[in-house]
Curated annotation (Swiss-Prot):
GO molecular function: alkylbase DNA N-glycosylase activity; DNA binding
Name recorded for this polypeptide: Putative 3-methyladenine DNA glycosylase
Any one GO biological process: base-excision repair
InterPro entries (alphabetical): Formyl_transferase-like_C_sf, MPG, MPG_sf
Species of the source: Bacillus thuringiensis (strain Al Hakam)
Keywords linked to the UniProt accession: DNA damage, DNA repair, Hydrolase
């Protein structure tokens, strides 16, 4: 079942934790690619110096953040790596959750080809498929074309995992500082990164 619009409403930190264990799905050329979300970071808008929308900054790139929750915010870093975020909070409150890492589930062969241009890969390469925001976007075929897309769409959405299949019973959720935000002054220390401790696909222990 797709996560309904109400799933993305409410406190961004709570939405971030709720996203753990759910399945990120992207249909590419009719083939389902997906992975279980194992690591996220919350960004809380105007008061968060690490957020693109800090101080209420509103640009063509960030405009989608000011819209309705439950939409995709995709941007480029270093001019080459895409990052996928889920918009949260009410309209006009530019907050979101960065999906940092997933465990591949569906479309494994397509994911391997997207990452390594081959399907015969080593164990180390397999572990490296989707353990970072840029890696998972490349693996799932998420690009700037997906910016602003509703997560109620058939081709890009969050699929809720049934409780009996949820991996939360196997891993402890740990909170810590977000990664690569040295510019963000006191916000560097906010414990707004959430991940499954010990999960092999987490980007950084």
């Amino acid at each position: 079942m797709q996560a309904p619009p109400s799933f993305y409403e409410g406190d961004t930190l709570e939405v971030a934790k709720k996203l753990l264990g759910q399945k990120l799905v992207h249909i590419v050329d009719g083939i389902k690619r997906s992975g279980i979300i194992v690591e996220v970071e919350a960004y809380k808008g105007p008061g968060d110096k690490a957020a693109h929308s800090y101080g209420g900054r509103r640009t063509d790139r960030t405009e989608v953040m000011f819209g309705a929750p439950g939409h995709a915010y995709v941007y480029l870093i270093y001019g080459m790596y895409h990052c996928f975020n889920v918009i949260t909070a009410p309209v006009g409150t530019p907050q979101g959750v960065l999906i940092r890492a997933i465990e591949p589930v569906d479309g494994i062969e397509e994911i391997k080809l997207a990452r390594y241009n081959k399907t015969d890969i080593t164990k180390a390469q397999y572990k490296n498929l989707t353990n970072g925001p840029g890696k998972l976007c490349r693996a799932l075929g998420i690009t700037l074309e997906e910016r602003g897309v509703s997560l109620q769409s058939d081709t890009l959405h969050i699929e809720l995992v049934p409780e009996e299949e949820h991996i939360s019973s196997q891993y402890k959720i740990t909170a810590g500082p977000r990664i690569n935000i040295d510019y963000a002054e006191e916000a560097v220390h906010y414990p707004w990164r959430f991940y499954y401790e010990g999960h092999p696909f987490v980007s950084k222990k």
